[in-house]
Amino acid sequence: LLMLSFALLAANLTQAQDFDRREYRAVWLTTFLGLDWPKGHDPLTQQKQLCRILDQLQAAKVNTVLFQVRLRGTTAYASDIEPWDGIFTGTPGRRPTYDPLAFAIEECHRRGMELHAWMVAFPVCKLNVLKALGTKSVVRKHPELCRRSDDQYIMDPGMPGTADYLANLCRELVSKYDVDGIHLDYIRYPEAGLHFDDAATYRKYGKGRDLKTWRRDNVTRVVEKIHEAVKSQKPWVRLSCAPVGKYADLPRQSSRGWNARDAVGQDAVMWLNKGWMDVLFPMMYFDGDNYYPFVLDWLERAERGTVAPGLGVYCLSAGEKNWPLLTLQRQMNFLRTAEAGGFALFRSDFLTNNTKGVYDWLAGEYTTRPVLTPPIENPQSTLPATPRATLTRQGYDLHFNFPTGGIHNIYIREGKTFSFLGQTATGHFTYRPALPARLYAEYAVRAMDRYGCESQPAFLKIGGEIPSLKDTLHVADLPIDVKAFWICDAFGRKLRTVDATSTIDVSDLRPGCYELRTVGRKGGSHRVRLFRR
C-alpha cells in the first residue's frame, strides 16, 4: 500500500470551459401500458430487467432518467391519494410486493444517474380502468374536477381545485421519496381532435377573458401551485415539463396550428423565465423547417433555466416515421452547435433496442464521457467550501477519500480541460485508469450541493504536499545548467519567465496553485517544485 500525500488547493477558474460543459442526457422510461417497463408481473423479474435497462443507459452515459410514476390517475409508488397502476401486478389498484419507484431511485443513484419523477398531469383514465378502480379513482373521489373526453376522463384545468389536487400529489411524492426532479407531462389542454367540454367552467370562472387567455392562465396557475408545493418541501428538486415542441408561430415559419402557447395553453417560456420551471424538455419530434428554427426559438426566448429539446428516437422505427439514423444524428449535433442544455430521448425501448444502430452511435460517438447535469438556481446563493481530501494508491487503483460529508465530483486533466470522472456521496471514490501513466495525471475535486452548484476546485498532484508561500520562493541547490525559470499555473500554462536565482519574488501572484519549471540552456524543461500562494 503506497500512501500518497496530495495538496488540495483552491484556485479561481480563469475560464468556465476549463471544466467539462454540463448537459442533460435524459431518457423517458414509460411505464404506461408497459411500453418501456419489463414484461410480466413477477417482482424479481421486473427488478432484474429494470436493472438491465438502467445498465444500458448508464453505459451510454445517460445522466437523467425520466421515470413515469403517475400514469393516468394511477401511480408507480405508494400514495395515500391515488391508487396503484395495474401494470405492476396485473390488477389496477393492487399494491405490488415492492415499491417500483423506491427501487428505481436506488438503482439510478447507484449508477450515478438522476431520477426525475414523470407525472402525467391532466389525463386520468380510460373508461375500462375506471370500472376496475371503482371508488379509488379521482373521477369518483372528485367528479367535479374531471370531464369526460371521448373514452377517457381528463382533469379540468379551469377548476380551482385541480391545481390544489395536483400540487398535493406532488408535495406527497417529494416528501416521501428522494427524487431529483418532478417532470410534468400533458400539463396542457387536449389537442383539438379530442372532445373536451369546459364551457360551463368558462362561464363560471372566465371573468371576461377570451377563451385562449383564460385557458393559458389556468394551466399557469397549476404550474405555480406545483412549484410552490415542491420547492417548499425540497427546494433543490428540479421542476421540468415536456411542452409541445413548437412554442409559437415564427415570423417566417408557421407552427401549422400546433404550438404550446396558443393551441394548448402552455406558456412554458414564461414558466421558465419566472423560475417556476428549472428545465424545459420540448417534444420536438419533427425534422427540417419544423425542427431547426423552432429549436433556436426556444433557446433564444429562455432568459434563465435550461432548455434540453426532446428528440424522437421512436421516429427511427419502421412502424413510425422510418427516419434514417442520419436525421437524428444531425439533429443532435445541431443541439451541441446551438449550445442547448442537452437532450431527452423518447423513448427508452427504442434506444436500448438499438433501433437502426442509434444506441451504438450514441454510446460510441456522441456521449463518450460522462457529464453532470446543469445546476439550478440556489436561493441561498452560497457555494460549498472547497474540499480537502486524502488519496491512496493501491496497485493501479486511486482511492479518493473525503473526510467531510456531502457530494464530491472528481475530474482529470486532459490538455487544457478537466474532464468529469465521477461522483461520490459516500466519501470515497475509486478510479482505475485505462493506462497506468494516467495515475500521474493532475486531478481536481469539487464539492457540490443538491442544486448542482460546485465549489471552487482543489487541484491534486502526486509528489508530496505543496508548500504555501507568502511573498518569496526559495530554490535550494540551484542547477548549474539552468538559464531561467518558468512559473506556470495549475493548468501548465506559462505565466512568466524569471531569472535563475535562489530567491524568486512571487508577491504579485494571485492565490492559487503554481508550478516552477527550469528552462535549460539546451532547451529542456523539468519541474522544480509545486507551490501555492
Give residue spans per PLM region.
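Active-site-adjacent "subsite" loops/lids of carbohydrate-active enzymes
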Residues: 22, 30, 34-47, 117, ...
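Catalytic domains of carbohydrate-active enzymes, especially glycoside hydrolases
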Residues: 48-74, 176-179
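Polysaccharide-binding and catalytic clefts of secreted carbohydrate-active enzymes
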Residues: 62-63, 111, 140-270, 274-276
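Substrate-binding cleft of secreted/luminal carbohydrate-active enzymes
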Residues: 268-291, 305-378
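Pro/Thr/Ser/Gly-rich low-complexity, intrinsically disordered linker/stalk tracts
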Residues: 361-404, 451-463
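Beta-strand-rich modules
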Residues: 431-453
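Short, surface-exposed loop/turn motifs with a glycine/proline- and acidic-biased composition
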Residues: 436-442, 491-496, 500-522, 527
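C-terminal tail/sorting-segment detector
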Residues: 462-467, 474-476, 511-533
